[in-house]
C-alpha cells in the first residue's frame, strides 16, 4: 500500500487489525456526530495564503513546559496502545523521541511506566484519570515521578464513560465478546502472531502493578467503569497539585469558564478536547471550542488541543485558532498498527513536511508567528460567532 497521508495509515490499520480493535480506536460515542465534526470543522478552517514573503528560513521548534520540541506536536495518551503493535507504547515512545517530541503514556496502557520510561532518552509525559481508588492514583504518581516523568496530563472529562455503540457490534463489548474477539484474531494471523503471541503480556501494566495481579482486556471495561468518580470537583485535585511538583496539564476543557477555573487552580496547561468524540456526543468540536477558550486564557497557561487532527495542515489550523501545541491520538495509532515504530516516525515526518508547506504559503516563519492572521477573514468571523 502506498502511504502518502494519515488517511492511508487508517486504511492499512483497518486491513491488519481485528475489527474489535480497529473500531475501538476508530469509533466514538453514541451516533458519532462529534467524532465526525472534529474532522470536518477543522478541515473547514480556511488558511490565508500569502506570497512573496521570503520564506527561506522556517523554524518549527518550540518550547513547552521547559522542553524543546522539534515541532509543536506530542503523542497523546491512548489506552490499549500495546494491543495495536507489539509492546506498542514502547514503539510509539521511541518514534516520538526519535522525532524530538514528547510521548504521553496512558493510565490504561498495556506497557507499564517502568517498561516505557527506560526505553527512551527524553522524559515522557504521563496521563492520569480521576478515579475513586485514590490509592491507585497516588501509587501511579509516585511511580511516574520515580521513572522521571516530567509532565502530568490529568484527564477530567470522564467522570462517567460515554456509551460507544460501535463497540457492541465489533466485539469489544456485547454478547459473546470474548468468543468473537478470538475468532477475529484467527482471521488476522499477522496481528495474532506479532501482538497476540509475541506481544504478551496483554494486561494493563500500570493497574496490574498496583493490584498485584494481571488486569486483562476482559477486566478493562469493568474495572474502569467501577472506578470513575462522578463526584469529582476542583477541590479534589488539590492534593495532586501539591504532590506533583512538575507541570500539570488539565485535559478535557471545552468551555471558557472551565479554562478560567484551570487558571485559578494553578494548572500549567490545558488540553482543549472532547476526548476524540468518545464521551458526550453533540458537544462542540475542539476546533469550534478553541477560539473562545484562547480569548479567555491565552498567555495565562499553555493551551494544547486534540481531536480531529490528521495532518500538518490541521496542526497549523489549531495553532492559528489559538493553541500552543497539539496532541495526536488516532492518527499515530493508525500508523503504529500499520507499521510499528517506523510507521509513527514516517507519519511525523509527513506532518512536519505538511506544516512546512502550510507555513510557507501562509507567510509564517516560526511557530510563534502562527496566529489568527494566518486564517481567512471568513474563518475568523466564524470563530468569533461561537464565542460566548
From Swiss-Prot:
Pfam families named in the record: FMN_dh
Catalytic activity: (S)-lactate + A = pyruvate + AH2
Enzyme kind, highest EC tier: oxidoreductase
GO cellular component: plasma membrane
Subcellular location: Cell inner membrane
InterPro entries: Aldolase_TIM (IPR013785), Alpha-hydoxy_acid_DH_FMN (IPR012133), FMN-dep_DH (IPR000262), FMN_HAD (IPR037396), FMN_hydac_DH_AS (IPR008259), LldD (IPR020920)
Known EC number: 1.1.-.-
Annotated positions binding FMN: 106, 127, 155, 251, 306-330
PROSITE patterns: FMN_HYDROXY_ACID_DH_1, FMN_HYDROXY_ACID_DH_2
Keywords: Cell inner membrane, Cell membrane, Flavoprotein, FMN, Membrane, Oxidoreductase
Disulfide feature: none
Keyword Cell membrane annotated: yes
Membrane topology: Peripheral membrane protein
Reported cofactor(s): FMN
GO MF annotations in UniProt: FMN binding; L-lactate dehydrogenase activity
Family label: Belongs to the FMN-dependent alpha-hydroxy acid dehydrogenase family.
Biological function: Catalyzes the conversion of L-lactate to pyruvate. Is coupled to the respiratory chain.
Identification of the protein by name: L-lactate dehydrogenase
Source species: Xanthomonas oryzae pv. oryzae (strain KACC10331 / KXO85)
Lineage of origin: Bacteria, Pseudomonadati, Pseudomonadota, Gammaproteobacteria, Lysobacterales
